[in-house]
Curated annotation (Swiss-Prot):
Gene: DMRTA2
GO cellular component, one term: nucleus
Transmembrane listed as a keyword: no
Chain intervals for the UniProt region annotation (Disordered): 201-316
Name this polypeptide is given: Doublesex- and mab-3-related transcription factor A2
Length: 542
């Protein structure tokens, strides 16, 4: 068709075309011959143009194919082949705008090529691991073991880490302000989880309440510094266990306050001016405050112990204070001294007493009436005189004096004294008639049926040497040897083991009927407190 469109421009082609169109079919042979003659008479350039294909298909057939040229040289008007030219280029260090743009493009292209190579390599390794281990669980296991770097497709544990580490106030140590909460949280999370670090850089939730700053343990505030907090926490702790309570309401703070008021070495200005509220004692299983508060309380030295500024190991007294937060520190210290520093034996003594008090139905949970509270206040006022009388009686009997925590003096205020049921003059002891298997040891001469001056060895206690030896041999496993350092008047702890007279067979089957009858007749009995809440007919405060 293209050939026919260009033929009329040639001389003689019009007549041949007319003859072909108007002539009969016999004359077609002559017309074909005429067209061939006309084509033979065309110039060579026109014939080549008619037979040439599209230029796009003929580009690869050029004599010299296109070779890469140096872009820097092209910017400066010089054409030079790139092969072997990069090192010797005249403008390789040129800093003009065009050369700088070329260098930036080269850097971006190199980074893209490296990234594509790395992605292709990771995909190949992931495909091989999927064939070896199976589904995405195998990929997650390989990512956790460090075989392949963690990618978003493999982080199946990322949500778990975020849920555990992103709790309200989980990373902020109690003792830091709001500005340092994010840094403390990231450090704590990086200590806990190290498999997927990039998911652990976030701090706690923005709407979570932060624990308030820690109050000092004593009024002078010289016991702990700001750098003694420990950021180690457990997952799930923090403000979930007690976000509104500060460290001053925890059992450790109460124990430290009581130690500052009752121990002789800790008396100072303002050391005995604080009084413990009876409603602040928490049960053993639900201690107030968070774990971070407890760790900070352990790291801060107690004011009565005079520790250093760094973290210290727990002393036996601290262990007893944590195990029994409802008891006073001075009382636990006396129990520990009586057990020779053995923490296990001291815990057994306190637990035996608690078990005996619960079985007897006279547990410490029974609230006293108003008259009993008034009698307790009167007993508190008269306590130093009773201690002085007990010390004088012990000195007259020739026995050892009072222990250091029990000596009356200006360092020990009355409301921080340890509660000893026998810390009184021997003449003030009445006839106590509780003789069941769960009754505490009674330091009463009339109870054992012996004269007070019969034997010089046990004169203050009214114990004969025979019965004392028998009771020590028979009840050593139940803690009767605890009497040894306190063999003076009024210093025998009333723990929950049986008195020596109750080892007779006639008394083994007795119950609390005698105690009930004594309660009806208003006879003074020992209750279920650690050292007996009844002294001279007045219940003492626990």
């Amino acid at each position: 068709m293209e050939l026919r469109s260009e033929l009329p421009s040639v001389p003689g082609a019009a007549t041949a075309a007319a003859a072909t169109a108007t002539g009969p079919p016999v004359a077609s042979v002559a017309s074909v011959a005429a067209a061939a003659a006309a084509a033979a008479s065309l110039p060579v350039s026109v014939a080549g143009g008619l037979l040439r294909g599209p230029p796009l298909l003929l580009r690869a057939a050029e004599k010299y194919p296109r070779t890469p040229k140096c872009a820097r040289c092209r910017n400066h008007g010089v054409v030079s082949a790139l092969k072997g030219h990069k090192r010797y280029c005249r403008w390789k260090d040129c800093l003009c705008a065009k050369c700088t743009l070329i260098a930036e493009r080269q850097r971006v292209m190199a980074a893209q090529v490296a990234l594509r190579r790395q992605q292709a390599q990771e995909e190949n390794e992931a495909r091989e691991l999927q064939l070896l281990y199976g589904t995405a669980e195998g990929l997650a296991l390989a990512a956790a073991n460090g075989i392949i770097p963690p990618r978003p497709a493999y982080e199946v544990f990322g949500s778990v880490c975020a849920a555990d580490g992103g709790g309200p106030g989980a990373g902020a140590p109690a003792g830091t302000g709001g500005g340092a909460a994010g840094a403390g949280g990231s450090e704590a999370k990086l200590q806990k989880f190290d498999l997927f670090p990039k998911t652990l850089l976030q701090a706690g939730r923005p709407g979570s309440p932060l624990p308030p700053p820690v109050k000092p343990l004593s009024p002078d505030g010289a016991d702990s510094g700001p750098g003694t907090s420990s950021p180690e926490v457990r997952p799930g702790s923090g403000s979930e266990n007690g976000d509104g309570e500060s460290f001053s309401g925890s059992p450790l703070a109460r124990a430290s306050k009581e130690a500052g008021g009752s121990c002789p070495g800790s008396a100072g200005p303002g050391g005995g001016g604080e009084e413990d509220s009876p409603g602040s004692a928490s049960p053993l299983g639900s201690e107030s405050g968070s774990e971070a508060d407890k760790e900070e309380g352990e790291a801060a030295p107690a004011p009565g112990l005079g520790g250093g500024s760094g973290p210290r190991q727990r002393t036996p007294l601290d262990i007893l204070t944590r195990v029994f937060p409802g008891h006073r520190r001075g009382v636990l210290e006396l129990v520990l001294q009586g057990c020779g520093g053995d923490v296990v034996q001291a815990i057994e003594q306190v637990l035996n007493h608690h078990r005996g008090g619960l079985a007897a139905g006279l547990g410490p949970a029974a609230p006293p009436d108003k008259a009993a509270v008034g009698a307790a206040a009167a007993a508190d006022d008269a306590w130093p005189s009773r201690v002085d009388a007990a010390a004088a009686a012990a000195a007259a009997a020739g026995g050892p004096g009072l222990p250091a925590p029990l000596q009356a003096g200006p360092a020990a205020p009355p409301h921080h004294r340890p509660l000893l049921a026998g810390a009184m003059a021997p003449g003030a002891l009445g006839s106590l008639s509780s003789r069941s298997a769960f009754s505490p040891l009674q330091p009463n001469a009339s109870h054992f049926g012996a004269d007070a001056g019969a034997y010089p060895l046990g004169a203050p206690l009214g114990l004969s040497p025979l019965r004392l030896a028998y009771s020590a041999a028979a009840a050593h496993s139940r803690g009767l040897a605890f009497m040894a350092p306190y063999s003076t008047a009024g210093l025998v702890p009333t723990l929950g083991f049986r008195p020596p007279m109750d080892y007779a067979f006639s008394d083994l089957m007795r119950d609390r009927s005698a105690a009930a009858a004594a309660a009806v007749h208003k006879e003074p009995t020992y209750g279920g407190g650690l050292y007996g809440p009844m002294v001279n007919g007045a219940p003492e405060k626990q």
